[in-house]
């Protein structure tokens, strides 16, 4: 309820709901699952775990040592993941925003209209599924700042991966309709497939890119591309 607080430590809860003005704090040994945050605030502290939940119009804060998994950020939701925190198996829906200083691993979907901002020290460490495809898929926008890294990621549909000066990326697939914008940063092992576009602007360096039929790599003034293969 409005102004109410639930503190969970060393215990487990399920099927709860945090409404606007309400706060749930999950600390060491606490485990919350199968619940909704509807306009309220969820704080996952060191040693706490939140799983199988939805944030709708509210906020999620995962602090150092905290873990959040198997969740969805719906329209209007905002989430912050601090350095030392871990999140995985998540969907960021249209109109939601995730700010990342910690680490995201595997099974991530950034929907059209959603935004993921990766700041210094943050990392998207994707993986490959049993068929060899990346488990991190971007249809919205991912902005990667200096000191941040992303790997094993696919940019699909109308998605955009924007790599700013001082950021790094490797093992990226740019698929049909996807855009990879590279400025002042370095990449390796980039696959640009039919309908995909990579643009390298001043200070950017694309190393080891492969351009497949129908794909496009544009190197602008001040940018560079090394060891490029065009199929």
Predicted regions, residues:
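The right-handed parallel beta-helix/beta-solenoid scaffold, focusing on the short coil/turn
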Residues: 2-4, 11-16, 20-24, 28-33, ...
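Active-site region of the double-stranded beta-helix
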Residues: 231
């Amino acid at each position: 309820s409005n102004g109410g607080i639930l503190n969970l430590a060393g215990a487990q809860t399920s099927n709860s709901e945090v409404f606007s003005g309400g706060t749930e704090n999950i600390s060491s040994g606490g485990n919350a699952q199968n619940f909704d945050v509807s306009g309220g605030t969820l704080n996952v502290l060191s040693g706490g775990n939140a799983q199988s939940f939805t944030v709708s119009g509210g906020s999620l804060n995962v602090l150092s040592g905290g873990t959040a998994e198997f969740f969805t950020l719906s329209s209007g939701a905002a989430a912050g993941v601090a350095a030392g925190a871990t999140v995985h198996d998540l969907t960021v829906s249209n109109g939601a925003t995730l700010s990342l200083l910690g680490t995201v691993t595997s099974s991530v979907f950034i929907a059209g209209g959603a935004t993921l901002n990766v700041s210094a020290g943050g990392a998207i460490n994707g993986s490959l599924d049993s068929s060899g495809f990346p488990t991190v898929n971007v249809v919205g926008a991912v902005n990667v700042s200096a000191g941040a890294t992303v790997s094993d990621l696919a940019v699909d549909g109308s998605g955009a991966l924007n790599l700013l000066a001082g950021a790094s990326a490797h093992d990226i697939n740019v698929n049909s309709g996807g855009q990879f914008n590279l400025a002042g940063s370095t990449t390796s092992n980039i696959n640009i497939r039919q309908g995909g576009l990579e643009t390298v602007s001043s200070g950017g360096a694309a190393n080891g890119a492969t351009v497949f039929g129908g794909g496009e790599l544009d190197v602008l003034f001040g940018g560079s591309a090394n060891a490029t293969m065009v199929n």
